Design a protein with these regions (language model features):
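Extracytoplasmic gate region of multi-pass secondary transporters
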Residues: 23-28, 220-269, 273, 333, ...
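Central cavity-lining transmembrane alpha-helices of secondary-active solute carriers
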Residues: 44-62, 262-275
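C-terminal ends and interior cores of transmembrane alpha-helices
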Residues: 78-94, 293-312
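C-terminal membrane-cytosol helix-exit motif in multi-pass small-molecule transporters
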Residues: 158, 162, 185-207
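Extracytoplasmic
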Residues: 4-35, 149, 240-245, 388
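Conserved MFS/SLC helix-loop-helix module at the cytosolic interface between two early adjacent transmembrane helices
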Residues: 55-98
Length: 392
């Protein structure tokens, strides 16, 4: 049962990340098909989904014990069809306002919010010894949605797929592209994911609890410490994923970045899974500490690769260092998430037993607080997806 729920969750979460980061590919191509948005506006479109995704992760982190994992996964996956359909029609009309694109980009953020409920739900299915690995697989393979989207979308827009309304657009260079396909290609898969979640997942009775029972987790000091640590790792990963293509386009305009953009998120997503598994063996604290040192090193090196006075910079060095940042931000995302699961489970068990509670109550409270903490901390981490592209 646990494995089946995990793999359906991975599929739905992967699709959520595909929708969440749609504008990292779409924004790069908007001005090619007749729009006249400024660079700042395009960066804003890539960043806005992270704002709504982060804010929505707060309520999403509490919904699983209230509605059940099966029901919520099906609902939260199904509603992502709305921004995909809308975006597909919007990009075909060059008169579509920037405000409309802002609204659609905010709706895409619902895909990012799914992470909080998905991770919280999976935490109920696995014991402490396997939580790091399970959460790493769910989060890491779910994060693959970013690289899957950045790989598939450029291919999808290069040819007509949906004959019923696929008129395509002519770029400023005279080429034809079908930008709507970047959004519409996910609709059938979202429908499949919705049905798979509804008929294949489970609502655990042990996972049921009210919002009032979950809110005390916000009073735990460890929650805010771990939120900052997670912001530095996952916030970096999602921020880099959102802004990497646009940053490369501004710094190295001769490079066709969409041929390479998916590599970074792909490396980071796989590294996240590895980070959780490694942390189960060596301890999340040790892995996270070493990882932070490496992240700082790569961040410092990045500045040396950019164009500046008297030199054109080096795209090869820029790309290599950025891949190092994707790798370490992915590893750190997995290791910090493993720390959250271990810390809150341990603290809650000790607190309940100190208050005289029995083992059954302690286990139930530990699962509830761990789930709520995982979701809320993920909300803080997602804010990096807004701030990092804005700094570019």
């Amino acid at each position: 049962i646990a494995s089946r729920n995990l793999w359906i969750s991975v599929f739905c979460l992967l699709l959520g990340f595909c929708v969440w980061m749609l504008f990292s590919t779409v924004a790069v191509n908007l001005n090619k098909v007749g729009f006249t948005f400024s660079t700042e506006q395009l960066f804003l479109l890539t960043a806005l989904p992270s704002v709504s995704g982060a804010l929505l992760r707060v309520p999403y982190s509490f919904v699983i014990p209230i509605f059940g994992g099966r029901r919520w996964t099906a609902f939260s996956t199904g509603i992502l069809i709305i921004p995909c359909l809308w975006l597909g029609f919007a990009v075909q009309d060059s008169q579509t306002s920037f405000t409309t694109f802002m609204v659609i980009s905010l709706l895409c953020g619902f895909g990012g919010a799914n992470f909080a409920s998905s991770m919280g739900n999976i935490s109920f299915f696995f014991p402490k010894a396997r939580q790091g690995g399970a959460l790493g697989i769910n989060g890491g393979l779910g994060n693959l949605g970013v690289s899957v989207m950045q790989f598939v979308a450029p291919l999808a827009i290069s040819c007509a797929i949906f004959g019923f309304a696929d008129v395509g657009q002519t770029t400023v260079t005279g080429d034809s592209i079908w930008l709507e396909n970047a959004a519409w290609i996910w609709v059938p898969f979202l429908a499949i994911g919705t049905l798979a979640a509804w008929f294949g997942m489970n609502d655990l009775a042990a996972a049921k609890s009210s919002l009032r029972e979950q809110l005390p987790v916000l009073k735990r000091p460890h929650l805010w410490v771990m939120a900052l640590l997670y912001l530095a790792t996952f916030g970096s990963f999602i921020g880099f994923s959102a802004g990497f293509a646009m940053l490369t386009k501004t710094q190295f305009p001769d490079v066709v970045i969409m041929h390479y953009a998916f590599f970074g998120p792909f490396i980071g997503a796989l590294a996240r899974s590895a980070g959780g598994i490694i942390s189960d063996r060596f301890g999340g604290t040790r892995v996270t500490l070493v990882n932070y040192v490496l992240m700082a090193l790569f961040a410092a090196l990045l500045f040396l690769t950019l164009p500046g006075a008297g030199h054109d910079g080096s795209f090869v060095a820029f790309f290599a260092v950025f891949m190092g940042l994707f790798l370490t931000s992915g590893l750190g995302s997995g290791s910090t998430y493993q720390m959250i699961a271990v810390i809150f489970r341990k603290l809650t068990l000790e607190r309940i037993k100190a208050e005289g509670g029995d083992d059954a109550l302690a286990q139930r409270e530990a699962a509830t607080e761990t789930s709520a903490a995982l979701g809320f901390i993920s909300a803080i981490g997602a804010l990096g997806g807004f701030f990092i592209p804005q700094t570019f």
